Curated annotation (Swiss-Prot):
Family named by the database record: Belongs to the universal ribosomal protein uS8 family.
GO CC annotation terms, alphabetical: ribonucleoprotein complex; ribosome
Keywords: Ribonucleoprotein, Ribosomal protein, RNA-binding, rRNA-binding
Quaternary structure, from the entry: Part of the 30S ribosomal subunit. Contacts proteins S5 and S12.
Gene Ontology biological process: translation
A UniProt-annotated Pfam family: Ribosomal_S8
General function of this protein: One of the primary rRNA binding proteins, it binds directly to 16S rRNA central domain where it helps coordinate assembly of the platform of the 30S subunit.
Protein name as catalogued: Small ribosomal subunit protein uS8
Keyword check for S-adenosyl-L-methionine: no
PROSITE patterns documented for this protein: RIBOSOMAL_S8
MF annotations from Gene Ontology: rRNA binding; structural constituent of ribosome
Length: 133
């Protein structure tokens, strides 16, 4: 049986790995997932990620998670907002800071995948992929 929401699977893998205090987690690769991970790296929620080929034509992402000096995870909450069955869109007027600007929405816009802060600077709205705090 095929998986219907591979992005939610990646977010769940990250959430579970951080709760288990793992340093690395792997997930199947796609360009959309890589763009989302780029945003998470820029915003300081994860340390880095590396894409490598597992088999001929099959790529996997190795995600290095980030923790505070006390050992607490940088990601307290990471949830999918827009799902394949229910898409959620926000215009620039309705795009407000998440969790008093301590968290972010990751948004797919006409100018690419970006954080809500970047979207407000550029004056664009779009589909809310997930929220991270």
């Amino acid at each position: 049986m095929s998986m219907s929401d591979t992005l939610a699977d990646m977010l769940t893998r990250i959430r579970n790995a951080q709760r288990s205090r793992l340093m690395y987690v792997n997930a199947p690769s796609s360009r959309r997932k890589e763009a989302i991970l780029d945003v998470l790296v820029k915003e300081g929620f994860i340390h880095s990620f590396l894409v490598h080929e597992v088999r001929n034509g099959v790529k996997e992402i190795n995600i290095k998670l980030k923790y505070s000096p006390k050992g607490e995870s940088n990601i307290k909450e990471i949830n999918r907002v827009s799902t394949p069955g229910k898409r959620v869109y926000l215009s620039i007027k309705k795009l407000r800071p998440y969790y008093n600007n301590m968290g972010i929405y990751i948004i797919s816009t006409s100018k690419g995948i970006m954080s809500d802060r970047e979207a407000r600077k550029l004056g664009v709205g779009g589909e809310v992929i997930c929220k991270v705090f």
